[in-house]
Every structure is written in structure tokens, then in C-alpha cells.
Amino acid sequence: MNRTVSIVIPTFNRARLLPRAIDSALAQTVPVEVVVCDHGSTDDTPQVARSYGERIRYLRRDQDRGPIVCWRDGVEQASGELIHFNYDDDWIEPQFVARTAPLLRDDVGFVYTRARIHEPGSEATRVMLRHPPGTRPMAQIVQFLLRDKLTVSPGCALFRRRDVLKNLLPEVPGARGVYGKNSGVGEDLLLFLLAALDYPRYAHVPEALSHFLAHPTSITTQAGSSGNMGVLADAYAVAKQYYLQQPGSMAPAQGLAGWWAKTRWKLASRT
């Protein structure tokens, strides 16, 4: 079954990086729709996007209302049944859609690939998400997501459009601080965890088909350089707490029970 795929590229003031993201989407070995959603860029982003003409759909909004609103706007305007988020500072291999889309069967909630991290000014890279390959029980990835301090990025994943519209929340309920307030931190994790409530399996492609650039303006890099990684982890902990409050959620495995009790106490002490 051939299903249409929309690659949504949310962007804000990254005219210099944007062409690589767009070019990688257009270079897919199967037909895709490319939607570039720009909320309030004040640099040359509009000129860069419009230079692609009818090869992409360019959505321009004058007001910046934050990443999540931009993500959702792009998905709402997309026509594909399947959605991939290709963030403006990242890029994907030409085979990304061809390798992931066939695995998104009826019982599979999402598909993700390994990702290669690139450091600016360095040829050295590292590969993350070296997980077991193939289609596997959803409980395996849920336990990883509950245990790990960070998460799997939507930038290396493929979802159903209907699931993104259902699970991409405006903000993580109960989140506090700079992260979790329409920043994409926590909301990205819930795309996976909330999808896990509706499907018994997920799929992983053991190839680094996604590329992430670690640069000074990325949220993770900014948090690390400013000593705010703890705040970042707290935002993800709030997302996990929200997931565990949902009917049908999978409780942490025995080895995680103590960790989760400490995490809940830590979050409660900050309210």
C-alpha cells in the first residue's frame, strides 16, 4: 500500500541552515510532499524558502508563537497520511522515507532510525539510538523512554498524521519553567509515549538515516552550555508523569520503580 508522506520542516531564523534540510527532503527516493512552516522569521528565511518555487509548500506566518504551534501548523496544512519532522538544522538520507514507511504497518505506532550527531567545525560524529532492529513489542521502547534522561527525537521518526494531531499537545500539562512551555521539550517525548497507548508495536531501522547538528542555538546545546540540563530533564520527567497518568500506560519496570519514586518526589518538591 502506497501512502503519501509529508515532510514538515518547521523553521525560525535559520536561513543559513534551511537549504540543507529542504534539499534532503527533496532528495528522497520516493515521492513526498515538503511543507516548510515559518513562524515569524526576520532573517532571509522567506527568500530562501521561496527560491524553491513549487517544489515545496511554504507557509509563512508573521508572528512567532513558538515551536509547537509551528509544528502543528505544518502538520495541519500537510496532505500526507504519514508525517516526518525534518527540523531546519537537521537533515535526512535519501532513503529515509523508503526505509521507514513500509514498516509503519497497522499494529506499529511509529518508526525511527539511528541518528548521527555532527559537531560544528569537526569531522567527528557519533551515532545514537543503537537499539535492537525490526518490529518489536511497544513495551521495550516505552521502558527506554521512561528510563533515559532525554528521548528519541521526532526528527528521526515517522508517524501517522492523525496521531500527531492527537498527541502533539500545546504544552506538557503541569510543566514549569522555560522548558515545557511550547518549547518542544517534553511535547516531543509525548508524541512517542501517547502513540504507545494505541499500538502494540514499534519499529526501528538500524541505520543512521537522520543527521542532527549540535550547534550553539539548539535547545540541547544551549541547556548544556548554560548548566540547565537538569531543567531539561525535569521537563521530560513531567512528560513521563503525564503519560503514566493515562489509562493503559505501562508502569516502569521493576528496576525503574525506585528511580521513578525519586523523580516524582523531586518534581513535587519544586511545585
Residue ranges and their predicted role:
Residues 1-24:
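N-proximal low-complexity "stem/linker" segments adjacent to membrane-targeting elements
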Residues 16-19, 43-51, 91, 95:
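Acidic helix N-cap motif at the loop->helix transition within catalytic regions
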Residues 23-32:
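Short, acidic, metal-binding catalytic loop of nucleotide-sugar glycosyltransferases
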Residues 24, 38-47, 63, 87:
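A conserved acidic beta->alpha catalytic loop
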Residues 61-78:
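Glycine-rich, basic loop-to-helix element that forms the pyrophosphate-binding segment
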Residues 83:
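Short aromatic/hydrophobic "clamp" motif used to bind/position activated sugar donors
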Residues 95-127:
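Conserved donor NDP-sugar-binding/catalytic core segment of glycosyltransferases
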Residues 134-225:
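Conserved nucleotide-sugar donor-binding catalytic segment
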